[in-house]
Amino acid sequence: MTQQTFTQYDFKPFLIDAVRELRFTEPTGIQQKIFPVVKKGVSVIGQSQTGSGKTHAYLLPTLNRINASREEVQLVITAPTRELAQQIYEEIVKLTKFCAEDQMITARCLIGGTDKQRSIEKLKKQPHIVVGTPGRIKDLVEEQALFVHKANTIIVDEADLMLDMGFIHDVDKIAARMPKNLQMLVFSATIPQKLKPFLKKYMENPEHIHINPKQVAAGNIEHYLVPSKHRNKIDLVHKMLLQFKPYLAVVFTNTKKMADQVADGLMERGLKVGRIHGDLSPRDRKKMMKQIRDLEFQYIVATDLAARGIDIQGISHVINYQPPSDLDFFVHRVARTARAGHSGIAVTIYDPANEEALDSLEKQRHIEFKHVDLRGDEWADLGERRRRKSRKKPNDELDVMATKVIKKPKKVKPNYKRKLATERDKVKRKYSNKKR
């Protein structure tokens, strides 16, 4: 089954062997769309969620055309975080495992926080593939230790995170050193307006491939919807965390400033809290990730973009401090829990202003929320969120009908409004009784 489905894309034998060992049964949705387009040499903007098979969607077809006899860089892959760059590099190692001895494909992982001089030494023999963070790759190119002028393909992974962390300028400088007929493959959960000038500069008529997020209502995730009711939201989150007693909980905020406010507020209330956002220095980020992996934190506050480039294991609870401004981020957030067969709880705190976004999540993403509130130490069922509005609707219809029957007189007298309202109320009561 594996061989049949992947061989239809004319992948070389070493890739088919690797796919078989990785136990891939059939190409995912994004892979089926990306493989033929990349093969044609077309530039691509790909949008898909975590866990969609995106990394292999771009690795398989680009590795397939590496010419091992040419000792020069043929493929550049940029990632916004060291952790993600390392993950991609490890996948390349797995996929090139079955190369013939005289056809070995070489790759280097070039990231900040490592000995740059040592990297320069290793680059005396240029690899076929470089994967790394934009800053380190750019530095090595500018120091003429790394030569990318013959590489026809560049992959920009998690592009919106690149933008958020200020790395797009570095990617721009790398791409500027590459051939004019460059194939650029950009992968991003969203395409922010500020990213578009960069895309326009390097991509002529790119293929836009968008895979809709999977239905996240399925599986083992319970979705709680909690009204803020003008309460102190940090107090509310604090109470939730104490009530849940999570293995590991992540609180998502929409901005870096808000992440700091929530983290500081929870720490003031006695919780030991980790934080992940784009303003952390590389050293602080590395330290934070080590602490998280060593289970030093039970609670983490994060922004969408900074957390997306990191694989955090064992998340039992996700709390949305507010619904995300982009609904695709909701999928990325809640998909971090209930992995590998485990169950999870995703809580979304909302204000009346969020009603429209919640409607979209229910209709477009098929989320089934439990409308609840934390009262004391117990969760109370609040019933349907839309109950009040649906109750009001018949009255609206009666008002319209009564206004048509009893019209405002052309010549008005004092107190006419009160008399008009009384007469219309009589009509509404009469009509209402008939309906019963």
Curated annotation (Swiss-Prot):
Residue span of motif Q motif: 4-32
Reaction catalysis annotation: ATP + H2O = ADP + phosphate + H(+)
Entry keywords, A to Z: ATP-binding, Cytoplasm, Helicase, Hydrolase, Nucleotide-binding, RNA-binding, Stress response
Chief location of this protein within or outside the cell: cytoplasm
Positions of the UniProt region annotated as Disordered: 385-436
Knockout-associated phenotype: Longer lag phase at 20 degrees Celsius, wild-type growth rate at 30 degrees Celsius, impaired growth at 10 degrees Celsius. At 12 degrees Celsius cells form very long filaments, with incompletely divided, thickened internal membranes. Effects on growth at reduced temperature are partially complemented by cshA, suggesting the 2 genes have a partially redundant function. Decreased growth in the presence of H(2)O(2) and diamide.
Compositionally biased region (Basic residues): 405-419, 427-436
Biological process (GO), any one: RNA catabolic process
Residues spanned by motif DEAD box: 157-160
A GO term, aspect molecular function: RNA helicase activity
One of the record's GO cellular component terms: cytosol
Enzyme class: hydrolase
Family of this protein: Belongs to the DEAD box helicase family. CshB subfamily.
Role description: Probable DEAD-box RNA helicase. May work in conjunction with the cold shock proteins to ensure proper initiation of transcription at low and optimal temperatures. Unwinds dsRNA in both 5'- and 3'-directions and shows RNA-dependent ATPase activity. Probably has a somewhat redundant function with CshA, as cshA can partially complement the growth effects of a cshB deletion.
Name by which UniProt lists this protein: DEAD-box ATP-dependent RNA helicase CshB
